[in-house]
């Protein structure tokens, strides 16, 4: 335990998320890389949210919810670093609802000032049996008792 990491080639932990990743500036998914996946991992889940939105909109804003990212030996030959969205990731991957009322990635869009965005990656001991319309709360509830390890990456973005 302890080697499970989530990083990005586009920004350092705590650094500035590139402009083109912003919701109104291209909405491009940042490149994310996973390393040190625990051996007993059956699937991975990713949640990106904005806790700083609480002050502006009264809740933590959900930007991305992804689950059933498969640990595939062809994709991860030696548990080395691998892109999160590799062409070999299977059709089991699901994207849930964001607070933009859509599925998939919704980039940073702070309404008032610089916000810190949190990417949380979970190594799970099972797949999650959820529909595509599932929310962050649904995923968090389904993960209860199945989390092996968690990795976190933060980035900032200003309007």
Task: Give each language-model segment a name.
Residues 1-159:
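N-terminus-centered regions that define maturation/targeting leaders and the start
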